UniProtKB/Swiss-Prot annotation:
The keyword Lipid metabolism does not apply. The keyword Secreted applies. One of its GO terms (molecular function) is toxin activity. SMART domains: KU. The lineage of its organism: Eukaryota, Metazoa, Cnidaria, Anthozoa, Hexacorallia. SUPFAM superfamilies: BPTI-like. It comes from Palythoa caribaeorum (White encrusting zoanthid coral). This is Kunitz-like toxin PcKuz3. PROSITE patterns: BPTI_KUNITZ_1 (PS00280), BPTI_KUNITZ_2 (PS50279). Potent toxin and weak serine protease inhibitor that displays activity on both trypsin and elastase. May act as a neurotoxin by blocking voltage-gated potassium channels (Kv1.1/KCNA1 and Kv1.2/KCNA2). Has a neuroprotective effect, since it suppress, at low concentration, the 6-hydroxydopamine-induced neurotoxicity on the locomotive behavior of zebrafish. In vivo, has strong reversible antilocomotor activity. In addition, it is lethal to zebrafish larvae at high doses. One of its GO terms (cellular component) is extracellular space. Keywords: Disulfide bond, Ion channel impairing toxin, Nematocyst, Neurotoxin, Potassium channel impairing toxin, Protease inhibitor, Secreted, Serine protease inhibitor, Toxin, Voltage-gated potassium channel impairing toxin. Gene3D superfamilies: Pancreatic trypsin inhibitor Kunitz domain.
Length: 51
């Protein structure tokens, strides 16, 4: 949850959620499909439950 959002290196268009440490809430971002980090969640609820 503390890592910055990282969309990844590929060019897919996959909606995911990450925890924004500045706003202190989960937000939507577009994941590229590969790479990235562990601050990436399938649903808003999963992000909120974890972070």
């Amino acid at each position: 949850c503390q890592q910055p959002v990282k969309p990844g290196l590929c060019e897919a268009y996959i909606p995911r959620f990450f925890y924004n440490t500045s706003s202190k809430q989960c937000e939507k971002f577009i994941y590229g499909g590969c790479g990235g980090n562990s601050n990436r969640f399938l649903t808003m609820k999963a992000c909120q439950d974890k972070c």
